[in-house]
């Protein structure tokens, strides 16, 4: 492609190739490079001398002030230092100009022997020149030189004489007046310069000259030659001359009336020096106004130590033919300066450094310096410039940005030698760019968009000599600023003072850490802070904290060679510089597409009506129209229809400018296979109307109390750029995870002190009372004594903020929860996220279509079992009947009355388990052949409803099914262990019977389950009506505030109402309670009262209580013993107690059984109604056996009397007085009724559904707590349900996020670093990039690590997963018992090798060990062999038992707490 192709004016030269640039340097440029470096060294030496003189003068003034007892405050002192810096820079420039004028040859100018003397001579004349400048400045302020008339361009030539012959030529100095006495430059280097039209540079009769540019406080009228030349109306001035004649103040001054096309200066990039140096982003040194001001292209810029001087984004390219330039807004260019290059320029302020500089120059000699200048402009972007640039232009560019190579170490060690004014603005600006979430062109900073790209690159860059623009320099400065604690470092001290001083005016810097385990709550703003916040200000962030990488989802940049936009190469006549274009489209191109006038203002200006800036544009416009509070609710201005990409044409152009070549292929939506797409957000399945409905719901805050909801709605009405673009709220914190004291089981309250320690895989907590009561400085945790000194003292005040996600298109930020973003699918650059606003735009412009619902598997995609099918069919049938009845009573048709829709019932887990009988209880009944274990099947049943197009989990219950293989007393029994729900069911009206529709649905699910169990052959169901304590959760984590926790009597009545319905449908035969059925002999019951008849369930109340009683009974002393629990005391059951109950033979276990039943009955009796026993089959009134076969003998006179065949035979052999009914003379006859339809053996038609986190409720609750899957609001319930379904469809995916070992922040998928030796040692990219990791082993990138789990596409779990799992468990058992060296069992040899690896592995956390541990846990969960030979099986089962004991202890403690509250309430009412 021809790079010299003519294009219209104001175009930008770009490169069409992504290959490395080829730069050809001419000998003339080599000579100029050598001259540049020597002149740079001389300037530094001049600056050092001037600075030394100024310090001596300042010492004199300080002594004078001390004698006069004058005190100078800090602000005045800082202003004085800044003023001195400006004076030194101005004096250095003047001295160099005088040296140029007085030198007659090249050798004389660079003669170091007489250099110091010449400088001191010139310094003696400095007083007069400064007086002239003060006079000129005073005249300017008085309005004497404020009017600049627009004149046409004139040709000004530079006449020089007195040539010298040294083999090199010096490029002429561009001045507005001819220089006299200067040494000659070759005639071939003389050139004519022309200035363009000067109109629009400064308006005629402008009131104040210093309003042209932000930050001009006092004009400094001086040319490059040092002469004092006042600005007159008939002298054409260029931008270079204007800024050379202008003195910049230290802090920017606000515009009084900023012109719309000249207010592009940025406070962070504002110069403090009165000239343009090599920081000019335009290679030719061209600096122009937004109109058409041009300047000579071969001027020698002043290479000031301040790298950010002269940064003017309103410049445009130079046009050599001087044609009139179009009056269009100028392109926005990226910041460029040597500060961000690999090499820094430093101005030494110590004269001891001058010999080193001189030695470097002398060693340089006449060596060639090829390619030096290209690094100073746009590294890697100049291509074939020998063919593109005229000779004069090349020579001018060669002098445009001289550089002095200084090692990076010197920058860190001697930060005072660099420009403090530059860093004073650059570091705060980097902090702003790191956290700014404003959309493109909406941030007050015009360069924010480019700076954000720099920050994103820096966050992940580890290349020592990175050539990415501004990367290395910024990294060095940030590392130094983070580590520097010296109060003598002027730069760092000034930056911190500047940030503290401007903390209310800097654009808000907000931390956004997702799923952070150690994040703190945002401090409350003061009244001043809140007032500044309303005006668009910000809170002051912690500098050290902000240096931490934010774990909002960062979209990491590819290497520089991969970010070349796909665009045509365009060149500009006259300039000819070929540059790699920005990923950001320049302002000129955008204006051409949109015809939109963009007005940028300095960031420190209070923009009027800032709250009316349309932040989310079209999307929020549509949402706000439907918001009850009015059209302006949410702080958005109702403007014309706009969006993140304002026009379809712009969208197309943006894609062409920013998309890499390999991504610039537009594919049709119709041909994309949804199953192969990486979908990160559920919003991609919505239609635009559904998206708007979702956002409206977010801002209603369903689930919160009325007070909190109104507060959040009010915050949404004052939405700022830092707020989430969906919910309109900025700072949201998760509910803290509840923690419990391991010794006593009591929940540790918020903000309470406690002690913590990690033991094995578990973390234990100890409350302050238990810690203080621990004897011998030891605490017993999990059967292990731990010294108290090892426990860490903590406060239960940890808060975790919600995470953020950034749109890849408009770069707006939203909460992960609001966006329904799946962070588990976030694989960095490969995962694309489109915000709802851009999504609506694309759908409405037909650029994409909503994905099919099958693209993201939901609840309906879960496996259908016979149980779930039975429950769904029954539920839908009952709902239809209820709806028909309601329509009949209301006189409407079936379709006219609302009903519950989109309901899905699924069995999410069905696992075989074994319940081991506790040791002491088993020992008590060993002689009676009591079973040592009870096999059962644990099932988890969940109800989902699609609410606002998201399937939300509303109801869940865990059940235990003991079949015919369990044996008595658990044979054919079902235990409803846990049940939970959240109050989001739709609709919310009541049924015909008066109950809520959600209650009706939940009751029907329970009745349907009992009906299913009865048909399978189960005889009874047991329910413990025990509500959780306030703040605790059973299944679903964090309930909404609008849902009250029911008291025990309310919950019991809820169950009994359900059972009454079931009785009417003949599902339930009889209801009683555990105490009346087993602890007392009522009526004609002839069964023994023994604990051996009690059904033994996992997690039930009485098994653990009985074990505690037996432990007390085994104690030998007669006195009292204090339990190590809260100072409570209980009496020991002694021999005297056994004699008191009539048990004379103390050695018999029956005596202990009888005494234990008595004590246990005393405990249960006050709450006996809570232990509900449901009979699904008829119960024999004599032996209390539930009859399943044969006949039941019924009495026609007595309604509820029936006995089994066995008891009937015994009844016939009794004497007449003992027959039914007892104590009555007239005896009743019994008639047989055949028992039918009860299966002889209980078999489950459904296959097992293994699940690591759904096999019991504690594992599921741990999953929700560890990932903050909360349900206290509908917005969080949607996201939590989405993630739960993700885990169900991806059983092999990691369940918990990886946490950084250093900062305790979440490490994203495929990000960060991992140690292959140390288990659990992971480091995020931010901590890794700080080079402060003291780890002895090599860290491996997690993106390339072999232990990264590959998630199945679209969450579709393999159908053979369960089958493979069963085969692996069988293989594990075989390999553990096999002793043959020639075993032919498939996989046996590999399994043995796997065992040997785990034994020899020193890491214990390698991928192989992790896989084996997962398999061992699955085996131990269901293992029934007490002498199992599988490695670690017994240990894993012991750990599981201890965890279950802790859970049981907490539940019993909660029951006792409720009993005490109930007793206290009864005392108060009585």
Curated annotation (Swiss-Prot):
CBP/p300-type HAT domain boundaries: 856-1293
Record region (Disordered): 1-20, 342-376, 518-566
Protein EC: 2.3.1.48
Basic residues composition-biased segments: 522-533
Polar residues compositional bias, start-end: 1-10, 342-365
GO cellular component: histone acetyltransferase complex; nucleus; transcription regulator complex
UniProt name for this protein: Histone acetyltransferase HAC4
Organism in which the protein naturally occurs: Arabidopsis thaliana
């Amino acid at each position: 492609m021809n790079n010299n192709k003519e294009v219209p004016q104001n175009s930008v030269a770009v490169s069409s190739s992504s290959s490395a640039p080829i730069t050809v340097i001419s000998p003339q440029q080599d000579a100029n490079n050598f001259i540049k470096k020597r002149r740079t060294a001389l300037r530094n030496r001049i600056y050092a001398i001037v600075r030394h003189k100024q310090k001596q003068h300042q010492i004199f003034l300080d002594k004078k002030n001390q004698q006069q007892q004058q005190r100078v405050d800090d602000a005045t002192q800082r202003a004085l230092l800044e003023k001195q810096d400006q004076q030194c820079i101005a004096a250095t420039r003047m001295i160099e100009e005088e040296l140029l004028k007085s030198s007659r040859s090249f050798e004389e100018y660079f003669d170091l022997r007489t250099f110091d003397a010449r400088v001191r001579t010139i310094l003696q004349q400095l007083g007069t020149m400064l007086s002239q400048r003060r006079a000129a400045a005073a005249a300017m302020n008085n309005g004497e030189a404020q009017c600049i008339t627009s004149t046409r361009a004139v040709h000004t030539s530079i006449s020089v004489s007195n040539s010298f012959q040294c083999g090199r030529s010096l490029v002429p100095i561009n001045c507005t007046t001819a220089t006299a006495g200067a040494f000659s430059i070759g005639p071939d280097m003389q050139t004519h310069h022309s200035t363009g039209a000067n109109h629009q540079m400064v308006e005629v009769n402008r009131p104040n000259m210093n309003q042209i540019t932000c930050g001009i406080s006092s004009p400094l009228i001086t040319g490059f030659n040092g002469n004092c030349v006042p600005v007159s109306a008939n002298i054409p001035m260029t931008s270079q001359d204007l800024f050379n004649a202008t003195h910049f103040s230290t802090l920017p001054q606000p515009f009084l009336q900023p012109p719309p096309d000249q207010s592009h200066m940025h406070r962070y990039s504002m110069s403090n020096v009165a000239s343009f140096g090599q920081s000019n982003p335009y290679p030719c040194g061209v600096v122009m106004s937004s109109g058409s001001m041009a300047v000579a292209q071969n001027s020698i810029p002043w290479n000031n130590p301040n790298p950010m001087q002269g940064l003017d984004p309103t410049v445009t390219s130079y046009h050599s033919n001087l044609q009139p330039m179009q009056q269009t807004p100028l392109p926005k260019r990226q910041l460029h300066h040597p500060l961000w290059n690999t090499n820094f320029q430093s101005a030494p302020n110590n004269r001891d450094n001058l010999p080193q500089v001189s030695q470097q120059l002398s060693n340089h000699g006449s060596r060639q310096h090829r390619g030096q200048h290209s690094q100073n402009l746009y590294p890697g972007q100049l291509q074939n410039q020998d063919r593109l640039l005229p000779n004069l232009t090349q020579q001018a560019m060669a002098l445009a940005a001289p550089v002095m190579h200084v090692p990076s170490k010197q920058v860190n060690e001697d930060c005072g030698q660099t420009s403090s004014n530059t860093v004073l603005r650059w570091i705060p600006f980097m902090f702003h760019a790191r956290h700014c979430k404003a959309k493109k062109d909406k941030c007050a900073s015009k360069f924010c968009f480019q700076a954000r790209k720099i920050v994103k690159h820096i966050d992940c860059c580890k290349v020592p000599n990175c050539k990415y623009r501004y990367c290395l320099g910024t990294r060095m400065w940030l590392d130094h600023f983070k580590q520097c604690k010296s109060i003598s470092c002027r730069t760092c001290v000034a930056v911190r003072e500047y940030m503290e001083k401007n903390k209310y005016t800097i654009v808000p810097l907000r931390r956004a850490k997702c799923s952070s385990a150690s994040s703190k709550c945002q401090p409350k703003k003061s009244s001043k802070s809140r007032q500044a916040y309303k005006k668009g200000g910000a809170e002051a962030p912690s500098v050290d904290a902000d240096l931490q990488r934010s774990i909002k989802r960062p979209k990491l940049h590819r290497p520089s060679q991969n970010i070349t936009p796909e665009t045509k190469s365009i060149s500009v006549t006259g300039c000819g510089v070929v540059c790699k274009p920005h990923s950001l489209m320049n302002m000129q191109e955008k204006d051409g597409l949109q015809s939109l006038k963009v007005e940028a203002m300095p960031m420190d200006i209070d923009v009027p009506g800032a709250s009316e800036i349309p932040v989310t544009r079209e999307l929020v416009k549509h949402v706000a129209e439907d918001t009850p509070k009015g059209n302006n609710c949410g702080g958005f201005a109702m403007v014309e229809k706009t969006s993140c990409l304002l026009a379809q044409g712009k969208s197309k152009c943006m894609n062409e400018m920013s998309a890499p070549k390999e991504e610039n292929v537009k594919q049709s939506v119709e041909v994309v296979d949804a199953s192969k797409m990486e979908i990160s957000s559920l919003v991609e399945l919505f239609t635009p109307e559904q998206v708007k409905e979702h956002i409206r719901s977010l801002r209603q805050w369903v689930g919160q109390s009325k007070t909190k909801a109104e507060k959040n709605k009010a915050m949404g009405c004052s939405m700022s750029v830092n707020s989430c673009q969906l919910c309109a709220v900025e700072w949201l914190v998760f509910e803290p995870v509840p923690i419990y004291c391991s010794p006593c089981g009591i929940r540790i309250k918020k903000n309470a002190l406690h002690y913590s320690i990690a033991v094995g895989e578990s973390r234990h907590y100890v409350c302050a009372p238990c810690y203080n009561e621990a004897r011998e400085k030891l605490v017993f945790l999990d059967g292990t004594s731990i010294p108290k000194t090892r426990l860490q003292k903590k406060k239960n005040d940890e808060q975790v903020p919600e995470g953020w996600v950034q749109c890849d298109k408009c770069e707006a930020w939203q909460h992960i929860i609001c966006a329904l973003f799946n962070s588990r699918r976030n694989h960095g650059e490969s995962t694309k996220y489109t915000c709802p606003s851009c999504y609506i735009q694309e759908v409405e412009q037909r650029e994409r279509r909503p994905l099919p619902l099958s693209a993201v598997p939901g609840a309906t995609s879960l496996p259908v079992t016979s149980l779930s099918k039975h429950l769904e069919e029954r539920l839908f049938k009952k709902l239809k009947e209820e709806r028909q009845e309601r329509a009949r009573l209301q006189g409407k048709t079936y379709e006219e009355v609302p009903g519950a829709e989109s309901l899905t019932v699924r069995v999410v887990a069905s696992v075989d388990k074994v319940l081991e009988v506790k040791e002491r209880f088993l020992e008590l009944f060993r002689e009676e052949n009591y079973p040592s274990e009870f096999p059962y099947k644990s099932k988890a049943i969940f109800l989902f409803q699609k609410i606002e197009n998201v399937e939300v989990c509303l109801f869940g219950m865990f059940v235990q099914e003991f079949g015919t293989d369990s044996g008595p007393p658990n044979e054919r029994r079902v235990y409803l262990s846990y049940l939970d729900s959240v109050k989001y069911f739709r609709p919310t009206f009541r049924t015909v019977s008066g109950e809520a529709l959600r209650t009706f649905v939940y009751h029907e699910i329970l009745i349907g389950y009992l009906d299913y169990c009865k048909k399978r052959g189960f005889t009874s169901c047991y329910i413990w009506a025990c509500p959780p304590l306030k703040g605790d959760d059973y299944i679903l984590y964090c309930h909404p505030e609008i849902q009250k926790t029911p008291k025990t009597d309310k919950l019991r009545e809820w169950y009994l109402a359900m059972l009454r319905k079931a009785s009417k449908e003949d599902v339930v035969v009889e209801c009683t309670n555990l105490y009346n059925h087993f602890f007392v002999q009522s009526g004609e019951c002839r069964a023994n009262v023994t604990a051996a008849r009690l059904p033994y369930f996992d997690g039930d109340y009485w098994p653990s209580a009985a074990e505690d009683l037996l432990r007390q009974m085994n104690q030998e002393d007669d006195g009292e013993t204090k339990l190590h629990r809260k100072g409570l005391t209980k009496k020991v059951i002694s021999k005297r107690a056994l004699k008191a109950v009539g048990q004379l033979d103390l050695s018999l276990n029956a005596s202990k059984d009888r005494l234990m039943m008595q004590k246990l009955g005393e405990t249960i009796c006050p709450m006996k109604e809570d232990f509900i026993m449901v009979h699904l089959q008829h119960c024999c009134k004599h032996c209390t056996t539930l009859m399943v076969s044969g006949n039941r003998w019924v009495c026609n006179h007595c309604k509820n009397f029936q006995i089994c065949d066995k008891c009937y035979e015994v009844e016939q052999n009794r004497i007449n007085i003992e027959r039914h009914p007892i104590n009555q003379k007239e005896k009743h006859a019994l008639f047989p009724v055949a028992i039918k339809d009860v299966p002889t053996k209980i078999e489950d038609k459904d296959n097992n559904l293994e699940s690591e986190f759904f096999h019991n409720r504690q594992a599921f609750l741990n999953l929700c707590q560890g990932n903050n899957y909360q349900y206290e609001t509908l917005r969080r319930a949607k996201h939590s349900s989405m993630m739960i379904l993700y885990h169900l469809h991806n059983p092999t995916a990691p369940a918990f996020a990886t946490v950084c070992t250093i900062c305790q922040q979440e490490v994203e998928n495929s990000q960060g670093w991992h140690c292959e030796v140390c288990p659990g040692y992971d480091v995020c990219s931010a901590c890794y990039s700080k080079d402060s990791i003291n780890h002895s082993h090599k860290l491996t990138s997690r993106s390339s690590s072999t232990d990264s789990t590959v998630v199945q596409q679209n969450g579709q779990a393999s159908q053979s997963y369960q089958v493979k799992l069963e085969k692996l468990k069988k293989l594990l058992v075989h390999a553990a018992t096999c002793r043959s060296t020639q075993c032919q069992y498939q996989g046996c040899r590999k399994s043995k090798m796997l065992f040997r690896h785990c034994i020899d592995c020193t890491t214990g956390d390698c991928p192989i060990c992790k896989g084996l541990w997962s398999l061992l846990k699955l085996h131990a969960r269901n293992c029934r062999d007490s002498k199992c030979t599988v490695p670690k099986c017994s240990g894993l089962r012991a750990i599981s038992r201890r965890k279950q004991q802790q859970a049981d202890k907490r539940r019993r403690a909660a029951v006792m707490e409720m009993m005490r509250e109930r007793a206290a309430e009864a005392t108060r009412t009585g």
